[in-house]
Amino acid sequence: EDDARQRIAAQADDDARRAAADVLLDNNGSPEDLATAVDALWQSRIVPFAEALRSGTRSRAATSAQSPPDPTWPAQAARLLARIGHALGDRVVALEHIGSTAVPDLPAKDVIDLQVGVRDLTEADGAAFVADLASAGFVRVPGVDHDNAKDGGTWPKRLHGSVDPGRVAHVHVRAVGSPGWDWAIDFREWLRADPEARDAYAAAKAALAARHTDSGDYADAKEAWFDGADDRLRTWRAARQS
C-alpha cells in the first residue's frame, strides 16, 4: 500500500500535465466519446505528423490571415522549446520565443517563431544536429540560410520547420550574439515595451495580409516594413542602453 501511495504521489498533477501536453482529451464523457476523439486525433494529426516526418515535409500556414492574440501562445512555445532543448542538449546556448506570437496583445499568423542559439553556426550544419532536430519534429528547410539586413548585407541562419499539422512553427537557428540573433530579441522587446510601435506593426501586417494572401508573398512584403522600422528600433535600443 505504501508503494502504491508513493507512486500516486509521484504522478504529475493536472496543471503539470496541461503544461506538458500538446493535446488533452477529456475522459469525463462516455468511453465511446473518448474513442471517437482518439480516432479523430490519430487521423487528423498523428498520422499526418508521422508521414511528414518520414518525408521531411514541414507544415506551413495556408494563408497570411491574422489571428487574434492567443494567450496560450507562450505556453505552446515553451513546450516546443523544451522539446528542442531535450533533443539538442548542451549544443544549445539559449532558447527564445520570438516573433509576433511572443508579444502580448499583438494579432499574428498562428505560427510560433522560435530562436535556437548556438555558439557557432557551423554546429547547426552537423549531421547529428540536423537529425536530432528532425527526430524532435523540426526538419531542415533547404535554401533558407540568411536574413536580409537593411544595409544590403545578410545575417546567416538556418531554418527548421515543424512537421506537426496542428502546430505550425518556425525554428530560426542563429549564433548567439550575432546581428540576426540580437535583432530578433530587440524587436520583440521593443514591441513589448512600446504599445504604439506594437499597434503600428499590427496595422501594417493587417494591410499587407489583405493584399497578399499567400504566406510567402506576405513575408516578402514585410521586408520593406522591417527596413523602415530598423531606425526606430535602433533609436529605442540606444535609449535603453544609455
Residue ranges and their predicted role:
Residues 173-242:
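Catalytic cores of NTP-dependent nucleotidyl/adenyl transfer enzymes across multiple folds
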